[in-house]
Regions:
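Nucleotide donor/acceptor-binding cores
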Residues: 1-3, 71, 127
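Rossmann-fold dinucleotide-binding core
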Residues: 77, 96-145
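Rossmann-like NAD(P)-binding element
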Residues: 34-35, 48-96, 103
Length: 145
């Protein structure tokens, strides 16, 4: 599955690394010039060791949000409503967008936003899925797997 992760802070890096470890192709959008390649490779190695798996996922760091294509998209930017809305408004698509927020109401972020909240640290085997907008059962099954 192809996945977009919006935001390269602590949780964004962790979520990206987790999906790569699970064998997915991840586009990680960042709005900074931080060099992430080595950081992500280190995180992926840690998760491979923790979960005792080594799937062949990959990641691509994207600086231009307009280049992201419609895929499962997880927003992980800072817990600031204005910033979340601004980032999401720059996407060229409006479906299959999930937020990792833990403190902002999904309805305040946007009409089409669902929740996909990962715990910290990412190795905690618990994910909160909040369904607000209809999405396909196929996508739901992929999320659960």
């Amino acid at each position: 599955m192809k996945i977009n992760v919006l935001g390269s802070g602590y949780m964004g890096k962790q979520i990206c690394s987790l999906f790569v470890t699970l064998g997915h192709s991840v586009n990680l959008w960042q709005n900074t010039s931080e060099k992430l390649d080595q950081i992500l490779e280190t995180e992926i190695k840690k998760l491979n060791k923790h979960f005792k798996i080594n799937n062949n996922g990959n990641f691509l760091i994207i600086n231009d949000i307009s280049k992201l294509e419609e895929n499962l998209t997880i927003e992980t930017v800072t817990e600031d409503l204005r910033i979340k809305k601004e980032v999401i408004s720059k996407l060229s698509f409006k479906d299959n967008i999930f937020s990792n927020t833990s403190s902002i109401k999904l309805s305040e972020i946007g009409e089409n936003i669902n929740g996909f909240h990962f715990m910290n640290p990412i190795t905690v085997p618990l994910i909160e899925l909040c369904k607000r907008k209809q999405y396909s059962d196929i996508l739901l099954n992929e999320l659960i797997m």
